[in-house]
Amino acid sequence: VISKWMNETLDWKGIYWNTRKLDGNFADQKNYVIEQCEGDYIFHIDADEYPHETLLEQLPQILKINDVDLVWIPRVNTVDGFTEQDVQKWGWRVTENGWVNYPDYQARIFRNREDIRWTRPLHEYIIGCKTYSHLPPQEELSLYHPKTIEKQEKQNMFYNKNFSKEMNVR
């Protein structure tokens, strides 16, 4: 998703593409990415997410206003093909727009410091941030996270097969 979006939307100046085989530990994967980064802040986007264009345009102002270690970003989750049964099974909250669990805040913009790292192999949690803020729950300041119900079911089966029940809880 992100590579297609980047090719269509962004000038590649200053953007580096790096790949690494996933070893089953998502925190290790994210910490590897941190080690590749330079600069004061890191804007971490998962491979199946993309930012609203306004969010990108306003990043310098967001960082100036929010002099914090971590900025939580609202995320628009869309799941094509879900049914009311899926909503009940997974305990989702669905908005009038069909967004799942909005604003589903994600830790995505954080200072590039050695003490800020990800922990937990699944449903990772960021540690080391002492100060934080949340962007308002507005679509133009959000990440998009589109998927199909088939992908959601496959993802849940992978998590259930490869991670303990305790690890599979946020």
State where each predicted segment sits.
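Catalytic-site signature of metal-activated, phosphate-bearing donor transferases
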Residues: 27-34, 41, 50-170
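Alpha-helical structural signal in soluble globular domains
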Residues: 5-9, 36, 62
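Walker B catalytic motif
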Residues: 47
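Acidic donor-binding segment of Leloir-type glycosyltransferases
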Residues: 1-23
